[in-house]
Swiss-Prot record:
Compositional bias segments (type: Basic and acidic residues): 119-130
UniProt-recorded name of the protein: Uncharacterized protein C21orf58
Lineage: superkingdom: Eukaryota
InterPro entries xref list: DUF4587, PRR29-like
């Protein structure tokens, strides 16, 4: 314990502090200073404590013009530190400014949509660059709209060209395609709104086109039986049958009248022998009209004198040659 106390007392002795007043050359007032272990006086500074500056900085850095030691030594001892800080800060500021400028340029390009037209127009119209940019943007938008309209019209025309041959030459399928063609010129001034329905129209009527192809086949089948019905009506019509029967009767009566005239024209010597043979065919011939009409029986029964009464009849009938 004695040994440990001795060095403590020995260390305390050189660190004795004696306040001493030293005049400062810059200011007429005195400064408080203390004693270091080496016995040399050091300025106390603002806090009144000494600072070992000789170990890190030479005396030339601590002194100033006039021999004064104010401001404190730690600030004067490192003259290179502020220069490094200033250079790094300047670099950071320049980098930030460059970034800001780049962002502004990007925003301007985005507003202009990356088009070189506005850049070319700016030097020509240096007095009003904003107007030139706006006009250029409007022109570009108009051109884009026109191009889109042309593309849409081309697509629609192609779709119609493909849909036409696929559907065939059916008249029922063509009318649904005609209305969209009439709508196209009316909708050309405002293409953006009605364009999507235009593209949908050719796709929607395709399934009904198959149904339309089946529908006309049914009427064709329905039209086939009517021509078959007409001949059935003709075959079973009563009027036509009556007309045919009347014509046949007229022809037969005409033949009978002619035969009677021929017999009368013959001389009397020849009339006696031939009277017997022709009477047999007369009785046989009327059998044919007997099936059609009952009037022919009377002709067969009539005597030869009755034939003379029938002579004026041909003038009334005046039928043509059979």
């Amino acid at each position: 314990m004695a040994r440990s106390r001795l060095p403590a007392t020995s260390l305390r002795k050189p660190w004795k502090l004696d306040r001493q007043k030293l005049p400062s050359p810059d200011s007429g007032h005195s400064l408080l200073c203390g004693w270091s272990p080496g016995g040399k006086a050091r300025p106390a500074g603002n806090t009144g404590a000494w600072a070992p500056a000789e170990q890190f900085f030479p005396a030339s850095n601590r002194t100033r013009e006039g021999g004064g030691l104010w401001p404190p030594l730690p600030l004067q001892s490192s003259p290179a530190a502020p220069t490094m800080l200033d250079s790094s800060a300047a670099e950071q500021v320049t980098r930030l400014t460059l970034k800001l400028l780049g962002q502004k340029l990007e925003q301007e390009r985005q507003n202009v949509e990356g088009g070189p037209e506005g850049l070319h127009l700016e030097p020509g119209n240096e007095d009003r660059p904003d107007d030139a940019l706006q006009t250029a943007l409007k022109r570009r938008r108009d051109l884009l709209q026109r191009l889109r309209e042309q593309h849409l019209l081309d697509e629609l025309s192609r779709a119609q060209a493909w849909s036409g041959p696929s559907r065939g030459a059916l008249g029922s399928a063509l009318p649904p395609e005609l209305p969209p063609t009439g709508i196209l010129p009316t909708a050309s001034p405002s293409p953006l709104a009605p364009d999507p329905p235009r593209i949908i129209l050719p796709t929607v009527p395709q399934p009904p086109a198959t149904i339309i192809q089946q529908l006309p086949q049914q009427p064709l089948i329905a039209q086939i039986p009517p021509p078959q019905a007409f001949p059935t009506q003709r075959s079973g019509s009563i009027k036509e049958d009556m007309v045919e029967l009347l014509l046949l009767q007229n022809a037969q009566v005409h033949q009978l009248v002619l035969q009677n005239w021929m017999l009368k024209a013959l001389p009397p010597a020849l009339q006696d022998p031939p009277h017997v043979p022709p009477r047999v065919p007369r009785a046989a011939r009327p059998r044919l009209p007997a099936v059609h009409h009952h009037h022919h029986h009377h002709h067969a029964v009539w005597p030869p004198g009755a034939a003379t009464v029938l002579q004026p009849a041909p003038s009334l009938w005046t039928p043509g040659p059979p």
